[in-house]
């Protein structure tokens, strides 16, 4: 199976399945001499891991990461960093009844069409369980970007179902189970989630991720535009069906005189473009949004077929998230960090000696 690696200079390759023995990844391109411990990675893993609230799947995985290589006496050596997380709470028996049935809205049908077989236990490689390793690798990138360049990456939920959320207080995001920045909407989210659990249904969500302190000049022309790579990275997250950079699809209703980010001697006067022009960072905040579909793993009966072509009624059993957007916040942060880390290393490799006299803000 190809497609397990992202990045050029900062490269992350993941492996493992939902109900396998373990998940792992290899991180290449980490500069030497960076202080790094397992505790540095664990914080974001704890934010993503299942079973931490009544609003997410009750699969209880400690997600304790192990650093297998690439770190000596507490600092990175410049060689490949191997990371491993053991799976400890698999319940494969929950899936034995559906081994011949294609769950609607899942990758069961497409995986079998592609490979001629599939690991039906929790979705195998297509499970969002894989994203634990992205978060671990992303934590390395976030640490480097923060300590060496002052770049801060943070994400939050900005919509659940038909409930829009305003970014009113970033400090609130880590104080509630929804990663919600809007204190006026937390009760409404709680009510919605309770109703969904009672109905056995699910709901979609929108997640916003913001990078501050990104220098101007990151990104490549044409095919490796910074916004293209960010969109690629975010679209690779399970259940993501749409990505916007800056104002995204809202620009359709704007005129050029409204949408252009005008510049004065004091800097940019707006940020409709999300901090990227011509595929290259402008030095403004980089802002991206992603839309996540409602999970198809619900107890509401639905129609599908089995591998013999027979129509059957499907009710998904097991432990699942009523809204996958909640735990997607640290995953989105990780993927943005991985892309920025890669482009920063590429910029340093090619254009380290470039100096300009034009203003920076």
Curated annotation (Swiss-Prot):
Q: What single Pfam family name could you report for this chain, choosing any that match? A: Chorismate_synt
* The record's free-text note on cofactor binding: Reduced FMN (FMNH(2)).
The entry marks the following residues as binding FMN, namely 125-127, 238-239, 278, 293-297, 319
**What are its GO cellular component terms?**
cytosol
What is the documented function of this protein?
This reaction introduces a second double bond into the aromatic ring system.
Quaternary structure (record)? Homotetramer.
Tell me the protein's name: Chorismate synthase
- The organism is Shigella flexneri serotype 5b (strain 8401)
What gene is it encoded by?
aroC
